[in-house]
């Protein structure tokens, strides 16, 4: 989960600090007992990058934990990540946490279809293709909208699921709640809960956002 986003956000923040000659910049990095970066904060006069790992839960994303599910580490050695990039009016935030349960994916899917309902219509996706109806939320979100934001390219592998993974999605193109299913491990169902807040699309003529 978040293996690409966490690494790229950290690199971006450090690069910006170096580009600014460190004038007025503040860089702070905390590591865990294993030497892994746990928090990274880069603040500059024109914006900043904050990366926090293993500090959020499903509740922070506005969702319940599936009964009996436990948070698990992924290939990035973190159970969760909270990445926030803000530069003036341009802001991107990605929050994600991985869980596993011995129950079937069908049971987990049914649970989160109900849970995501608080955010409006829920669509079921296999990769970029919808399964059943609705195929689009009332706010215009589709299965193919993961990488269609004009200001940032984003795909499923950035938060831990695969290219053709099963996903449940709710919300709008800019504000999405996602339950993405990862490859099963040791006979257990693995899934990631994700909240995406993407940058507004700027109107070049007026300078206003959507």
What are these regions (language model features)?
Residues 25-210:
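An acidic-aromatic pocket/loop used at catalytic or ligand-binding sites
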Residues 1-23:
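Sec-dependent bacterial lipoprotein signal peptides
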């Amino acid at each position: 989960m978040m293996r690409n986003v966490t690494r790229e956000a950290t690199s971006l923040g450090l690069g910006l600090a170096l580009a600014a000659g460190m004038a007025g910049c503040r860089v702070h990095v905390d590591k865990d007992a294993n030497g892994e970066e746990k928090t990274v904060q880069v603040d500059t006069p024109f914006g900043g990058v904050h990366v926090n790992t293993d500090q959020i839960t499903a509740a922070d994303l506005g969702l319940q934990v599936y009964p009996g599910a436990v948070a698990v580490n992924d290939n990035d050695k973190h159970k969760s990540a909270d990445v926030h990039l803000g530069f003036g009016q341009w802001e991107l935030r990605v929050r994600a946490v991985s869980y596993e349960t011995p129950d079937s994916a069908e049971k987990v899917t049914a649970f989160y279809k109900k849970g995501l309902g608080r955010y409006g219509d829920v669509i079921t996706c296999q990769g970029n293709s919808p399964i059943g109806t609705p195929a689009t939320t009332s706010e215009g979100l589709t299965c193919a909208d993961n990488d269609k934001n004009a200001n940032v390219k984003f795909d499923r592998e950035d938060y831990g699921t695969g290219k053709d993974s099963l996903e449940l999605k709710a919300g709008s193109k800019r504000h999405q709640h996602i339950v993405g299913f990862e490859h099963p491990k040791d006979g257990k169902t693995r899934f990631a809960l994700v909240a995406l807040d993407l940058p507004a699309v700027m109107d070049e003529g007026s300078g206003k956002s959507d």
